[in-house]
Amino acid sequence: MVDLSDQRLTVYNSDQEVVRVIPVSTGKASTPTPIFNSKVYTKYRSTTMYGRTYTVPGVPFTMCVSANEAICLHAAPWQENAGKPFGVPRSHGCVRMPLNHARWLFHNTPKGTPITIQA
């Protein structure tokens, strides 16, 4: 579950116990992350992200949660490398997270896993 107000992604096991809490950066005010219930549609170990004003190749550990692949959960090494902390809205709508957490989530989340994004 992604909580937009707390800028955290909480992972639960099948018994609804918290397994991991991950700091994230979701969409900034001008490009907000939508609130919705979905699932993991596609997974890419590395992919290129495209937007109106950007192209970012090699985005690691990407899991798309919208059928059109517009909203994804992924690592943001450029944010880490720039020293910009997670927990602050910074994206164009995706859910960014540190590389180590994105790697873990990618390897522990199969396609079809339900995803909730809430305010």
Predicted regions mapped to residue ranges:
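Exported/periplasmic cell-wall-interacting domains
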Residues: 31-37, 44-119
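Cell wall/extracellular polymer interaction/catalysis modules
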Residues: 1-31, 35-37
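Active-site donor-binding loop signature of nucleotide-sugar glycosyltransferases
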Residues: 24-26, 42, 75
